[in-house]
């Protein structure tokens, strides 16, 4: 018996918009494929259905400020033209120093001293600094109770580290907590010399315990397809498709749901010049491969436009193509 070919899934991100249980949506892929435009557009569409939406840039280039033509910082800021869409930018390479100082406000000086002590301890554990930065941000974000959070991620290598950060942090914090008994007497003696009698190693330990609890919850949510999914963005070229397949495989290994792929920057008219014709044929070739590789995915096709997509109005207009498949205007150019 020969299996009948699967019916293509709807070429739209409507499935994500309708999935009210989603809490975390990651958008990523190779550099230069238009991830930021796509993630910003997705956030705009989600804002139509959800009470509050946050888009976070974890790319040091911080392109969402350029996309919305508005300056964002490490504190969630309302996007111009929206009542329920917020944006923030973090630099994962900055570690705990990137966090707002208000985060370390507490009943006493322990948390402020703890910032420096934690940073020094964390620096002794290779690979955990970036993960801890993500961990602190996730703790902040969870406390803000946004309906859904969209991550505009850095190129693939950084993205995979972001996805894996809960496991890295859980392992690293376990080591830190095991060091507590060794560090506590030294820390207590040090702060008493400075006259800060209300500072204790236990307060720092409690902070680590609290964070570990949050990260354990995040880890569970990341691997729950009802709460977390990943949207891959690519262009119809060899290297981008290769990177996308690698990303899909790595996400699957990590237990992260992925069933939507955006193919961006597609040509729809091509006979006006020889280069356009050549590019069109290349894209057709890789679109066929994408159809074969990802027959059980929603594949969304987005156009290469004549003008940049910038500003809230531009993003709003472009975001409609995530829901309703793009139809090029009729011209003599088309087949």
Swiss-Prot record:
Q: Which residues bind Zn(2+)?
A: 273, 276
Q: What domain of life is recorded for the organism?
A: Eukaryota
User: Which EC class, in a word?
Assistant: hydrolase
Report if keyword Metal-binding is assigned. yes
Q: Which Pfam families match?
A: ArsA_ATPase
Which GO cellular component terms are attached?
GET complex
Question: Where's the active site on this chain?
Answer: 59
Query: Residues that bind ATP, according to the entry?
Result: 30-37, 237, 264
* Single GO term (MF): ATP binding
* Subcellular location(s) per record: Cytoplasm; Endoplasmic reticulum
Q: What is its main location?
A: cytoplasm
- Function in brief: ATPase required for the post-translational delivery of tail-anchored (TA) proteins to the endoplasmic reticulum. Recognizes and selectively binds the transmembrane domain of TA proteins in the cytosol. This complex then targets to the endoplasmic reticulum by membrane-bound receptors, where the tail-anchored protein is released for insertion. This process is regulated by ATP binding and hydrolysis. ATP binding drives the homodimer towards the closed dimer state, facilitating recognition of newly synthesized TA membrane proteins. ATP hydrolysis is required for insertion.
The UniProt similarity line reads: Belongs to the arsA ATPase family.
How does this polypeptide assemble, per the annotation? Homodimer.
User: NCBIfam families annotated for this entry?
Assistant: GET3_arsA_TRC40
For this protein, the record's PANTHER family field holds: ARSENICAL PUMP-DRIVING ATPASE ARSENITE-TRANSLOCATING ATPASE (PTHR10803), ATPASE GET3 (PTHR10803:SF3)
The protein's name is ATPase ASNA1 homolog
């Amino acid at each position: 018996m020969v299996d009948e070919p699967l019916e293509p899934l709807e070429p739209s991100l409507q499935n994500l918009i309708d999935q009210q249980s989603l809490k975390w949506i990651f958008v990523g892929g190779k550099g230069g494929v238009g991830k930021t435009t796509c993630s910003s557009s997705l956030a705009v569409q989600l804002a139509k259905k959800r009470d509050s939406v946050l888009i976070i840039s974890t790319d040091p280039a911080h392109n969402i400020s350029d996309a919305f033509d508005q300056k964002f910082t490490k504190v969630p800021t309302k996007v111009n033209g929206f009542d329920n869409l917020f944006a923030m930018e973090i630099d994962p390479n900055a570690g705990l120093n990137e966090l707002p100082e208000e985060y370390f406000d507490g009943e006493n000086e322990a948390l402020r001293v703890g910032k420096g002590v934690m940073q020094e301890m964390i620096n002794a554990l290779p690979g955990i600094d970036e993960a801890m930065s993500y961990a602190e941000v996730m703790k902040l974000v969870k406390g803000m109770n946004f309906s859904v959070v969209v991550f505009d991620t850095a190129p693939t290598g950084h993205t995979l580290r972001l996805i894996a950060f809960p496991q890295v942090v859980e392992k690293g914090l376990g080591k830190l907590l095991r060091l507590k008994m060794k560090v506590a007497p030294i820390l207590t003696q040090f702060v008493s010399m400075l006259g800060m009698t209300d500072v204790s190693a236990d307060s720092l330990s409690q902070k680590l315990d609290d964070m570990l609890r949050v990260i354990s919850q995040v880890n569970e949510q990341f691997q729950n397809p009802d709460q977390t999914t990943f949207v891959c963005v690519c262009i119809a070229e060899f290297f981008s498709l290769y990177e996308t397949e690698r990303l899909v495989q790595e996400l699957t290994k990590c237990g992260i749901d992925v069933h939507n792929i955006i193919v961006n920057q597609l040509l729809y008219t091509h006979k006006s010049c020889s280069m356009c014709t050549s590019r069109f044929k290349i894209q057709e070739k890789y679109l066929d491969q994408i159809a074969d590789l990802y027959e059980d995915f929603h594949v969304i096709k987005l156009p290469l436009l004549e003008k940049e997509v910038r500003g809230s109005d531009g993003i709003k207009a472009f975001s409609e193509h995530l829901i309703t498949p793009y139809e090029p205007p009729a011209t003599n150019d088309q087949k």
